[in-house]
Every structure is written in C-alpha cells, then in structure tokens.
C-alpha cells in the first residue's frame, strides 16, 4: 500500500498547527476527507444543485439520479439485498433514534431491551427514552476489565420478554472489537427470529468489510463522516420485511403517499423514513468516498491499520506513566490511555501545542469510564493515512510532556 500516495489525497494533512505539522489522531471522532469528496460536493453545487424526487426539470432529475445511485453504492458496499433496505439519515445518532422509536411502538409494558456496558450514549439514551415512554425494561451485557463483553451472560439475559438487542460493533471509547457473530447467534438461538438485533457500526464500518448478509443483523447504522465522507449524512440498513412493518419516524414531505385531513397514507421503505429535503450534496460526497475506497485493496488497508494499532500499543506501552486500557483485547482504530493521575484534558492540551490532535474526555461513554473509575481517557485513533512516523511523534510528545505533568 502506497501510504504517501494516499496521504496526498487528503489536503488537510499538509496543514500546520501551532507551527508544527498536523498529526491527526482523532479519526474516531471524524475522518479527514479526500480531494475527490471535496470536489464531488463542489461540482454538485456548481452544476447540479436541485431538490430531488418529483421534479420534472432536468436539474432535479440529474440530482435525483445522483442521489439514488449512491443508495445503490451503499447497498453493494454492505451487500444488502435491495436498495429499499438503505435509509438515509443525518448520522448514526439519528439512525438509532429512528430505530428506538419505531421498533418499540408496538411493544408491551415489561418487554425488554438489551444493551451493553460499552455503548456510546447514542446507543443508550434513545432506548431509555423509548423505554420510559412505553414501560419497557433495559438490561445490560457487562464487560470485563479489558472491555470485552461477557457474552455468556446472554444465556440469562435473553428471555421471552426480550425484543431488541442493540450493540456496537466496536467500542468507540476503547477500540475493542465485539464478537457480533456470537451475540447474533445467541440472539437467534435463544430469542428466535422475532428478537431484533441492531448494530451500531459507527466505529466498525471504517476498519472492516461489513457484509450484512453474513452478519445476519436486522439493522446496521453508520455515519458517513467516519468513512472519509461528509458530516450530515448516515445510513440505516434494515431487512426489508421488517422495515415494511415499521411506522414512520418523522412526518413531512416524501414519506407520504396521500395526505388528507381525515387520513394520511405513507410511502414504502426507504422513503417512509426520509421525511423532508435530504442532504443531497453530502450523499454525493458519500458516493465519492465509497468510490475512493473501492479503488483500494481494503484487505490491505485493514491489515495496515492493524499494524498501526500494534505499533502504537508497543510504543506507548514502553513509556513510564502511560496506562493503556483494554491492552490485551482485540482492538481496531482507537487506543485509550491515561498518564498517571493526570487529567486527560491536560495531556491533550499539551500535545496540541506539538501539533498532535487526539480526543480527551469520556467519549460519550460514561458507563465505560465509571467501570474504570476514571473521569475520562486520552484517545488516539487511526485511519488509513496514519503513519508509524506519526505514532513516533505521539510517543515522543508524551515523553516530552510527562515530566511537566507528573
């Protein structure tokens, strides 16, 4: 893999911060965008900008074709059966809110939802809101001190009242890869086909090839901006047979068939779930990002990212005072650590002075932080353009600032 050629596709990597070359290690928060994505969005606004669907004029028809072609690209990328299984959203958060609202509308008081201890707040709070509204109970898969989910607990957690399991593919705070195949297998064997399995793929989609047929989840959500595409657009994949049974999430244009004051009938999936004017330019950018990725050998990319993770863990483990979380777990993309009892904000602030961008805090995963009895962590997260030289700069930066902090 020609890492230097890849890096040249990302203009922002040439920037300087505080007089230092940018070392961007905050990819779990958002990835940078290649030139082809920026140019595709600019080209759309220069030449094709129009609202999609129902327009008889040429610009609208061209914009609609572009918009729907990306839906087909996403279908292929996920190996979904039909484009009707691909719903555009604003991101993973909206996708999970959509599912929490629609999947629970017909549940009974006392029915149960299973989440995990390692979830991002976006895969906790929407389910809590739905549970409070409908009298549902939430149960939790615990994790061990390496951040690994205790999947054997599902044998006791799943019962006849269990209706939904929603788990992340990869922990956003620790980078731990969860054993989805085992979770879904237990869901099917213990809960049957009526037990819905939702996967938060926000941190998984960028570091692995996702095949929803092989995975056999009922729903899979991700955000485009974690996949080298723009902010403002996301995807929910859902099995068509289930989507057709779900009520709308929001009301407005496009999601209807016919509106009257006495009765309104709703569109078919996916349009039933896409009320209002969509983020067309962002969708075009997503298509460009997928095309960019499809030109690469993704198996080679993922192997390279694993190499970067191993190297980062090796380099940081050798630094006195650095404590790495989930050190022995299978991880991808993110490495969480602390420096002694120093607040991670202080670590991040000093590294920023050296041009190094990391994320600090609880990473919208407060239950994880409570598990370890810490306020937060420093998190370095990687992408296909991350180099070993950048990891060295991070390690050298930590060695430089630690004497100032301890």
Roles of regions detected by a PLM:
Residues 1-406:
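Pyridoxal 5′-phosphate
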